[in-house]
């Protein structure tokens, strides 16, 4: 089983799709990595030899931030926004949508499930 950047790539998928299982690599980035390392995108992961795997590993380590390092960077960027007290940081801190979406209705994914208000009952007619 091919293991790159701490992720086991699925054996039956093509290399281009298999690389997208690594956090921080999408289809376009996978295409660029394959082109730069000289590995054919038509190959399946199970058909890669050790030389191809090493080329892919080196290309990813040298030129791309993936997995833990990328997650840390994103978390630090959000923490920085909160620390400087920007509007976006405040929205992150309160658990509300950050990019201008409405919150009067909707925004349930970000806000979480509704909470009941104690003592407030619906009036039945």
UniProtKB/Swiss-Prot annotation:
Alphabetized UniProt keyword annotations: Ribonucleoprotein, Ribosomal protein, RNA-binding, rRNA-binding, tRNA-binding
Superkingdom of source: Bacteria
InterPro entries: Rbsml_uS13_C, Ribosomal_uS13, Ribosomal_uS13-like_H2TH, Ribosomal_uS13_bac-type, Ribosomal_uS13_CS
GO CC term, one of those recorded: cytosol
Organism: Gemmatimonas aurantiaca (strain DSM 14586 / JCM 11422 / NBRC 100505 / T-27)
Keyword rRNA-binding annotated: yes
Function: Located at the top of the head of the 30S subunit, it contacts several helices of the 16S rRNA. In the 70S ribosome it contacts the 23S rRNA (bridge B1a) and protein L5 of the 50S subunit (bridge B1b), connecting the 2 subunits; these bridges are implicated in subunit movement. Contacts the tRNAs in the A and P-sites.
Record's keyword annotation contains Metal-binding: no
NCBIfam families per UniProt: uS13_bact
Protein name per its UniProtKB record: Small ribosomal subunit protein uS13
Gene Ontology molecular-function annotations: rRNA binding; structural constituent of ribosome; tRNA binding
Gene Ontology biological process terms in this record: translation
Similarity section: Belongs to the universal ribosomal protein uS13 family.
Subunit structure: Part of the 30S ribosomal subunit. Forms a loose heterodimer with protein S19. Forms two bridges to the 50S subunit in the 70S ribosome.
Stretch list, region Disordered: 90-125
């Amino acid at each position: 089983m091919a293991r790159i950047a701490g992720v086991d790539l699925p054996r039956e998928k093509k290399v281009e799709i298999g690389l997208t299982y690594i956090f921080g690599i999408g289809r376009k980035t996978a295409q660029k990595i394959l082109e730069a390392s000289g590995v054919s995108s038509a190959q399946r992961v199970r058909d890669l030899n050790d030389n191809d795997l090493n080329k892919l590993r080196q290309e990813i380590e040298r030129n791309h931030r993936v997995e833990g390092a990328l997650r840390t960077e994103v978390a630090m960027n959000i923490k920085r926004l909160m620390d400087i007290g920007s509007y976006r940081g405040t929205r992150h801190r309160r658990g509300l949508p950050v990019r201008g979406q409405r919150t009067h209705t909707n925004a349930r994914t970000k806000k979480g499930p509704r909470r009941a208000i104690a003592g407030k009952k619906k009036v039945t007619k």
